[in-house]
UniProtKB/Swiss-Prot annotation:
Name of the protein: Ninjurin-2
Binding-site residues for cholesterol, renumbered to this chain: K104
Species per Swiss-Prot/TrEMBL record: Mus musculus
Helix alpha1: annotated segments: 26-38
Gene this protein is translated from: Ninj2
Pfam families: Ninjurin
Residue ranges, annotated region (Helix alpha2): 39-58
Induction annotation: By nerve injury; in Schwann cells.
TM stretches of this protein: 62-93, 98-127
Subunit annotation: Homooligomer; in response to stimuli, homooligomerizes into filaments. In contrast to NINJ1, the filament is curved toward the intracellular space, preventing its circularization on a relatively flat membrane to mediate plasma membrane rupture: curvature is caused by cholesterol-binding at the cytoplasmic leaflet.
Record has GTP-binding as a keyword: no
Length: 143
């Protein structure tokens, strides 16, 4: 190791005459984290609307407790994932001393995303999306 702030050099297949071309892995990781955060915001908004729909139906709706619990757990996981992605974006991947910590954070975020996907599959299976259409059809307000 040359120094504590050593940067990683990668060789492109189609590199120019200079041979090695410097790639800023930190910039790549930051862009990836921002893109994941945008997807997380979209899912968060969708789950918030599902929660609103289920709550409007009331506690006598089918699977009410199950859906409310799953949606709240999903929302909480999404907040934790967002915080992890912010920390991943803040830390510099090019600094060797951060790489091990960033790898652990990235693994944790990936596991939490997988769990969130599974929870959202169950939310869809229990019919939270039907709750909105049922509430709209049974509403006494004219369209």
């Amino acid at each position: 190791m040359e120094s504590d702030r050593e940067t990683i050099h990668l060789q492109h297949r189609h590199s120019m005459r200079g041979g090695n071309q410097r790639i800023d892995l930190n910039f790549y990781a930051t862009k990836k984290s921002v893109a994941e955060s945008m997807l997380d915001v979209a899912l968060f908004m969708s789950n918030a609307m599902r929660l609103k729909s289920v709550l409007q139906q009331g506690p006598f709706a089918e699977y009410y407790t199950t859906l409310v619990t799953l949606i709240i757990v999903s929302l909480l996981l999404q907040v934790v994932i967002s915080l992890l992605l912010v920390f991943i974006a803040i830390l510099n991947l090019n600094e060797v001393e951060n790489q091990r910590h960033l790898n652990k954070l990235n693994n944790a975020a990936t596991i939490l995303v997988f769990i969130t996907v599974v929870i959202n599959i169950f939310i869809t299976a229990f019919g939270a999306h039907h709750a909105a259409s049922m509430a709209a059809r049974t509403s006494s307000n004219p369209i």
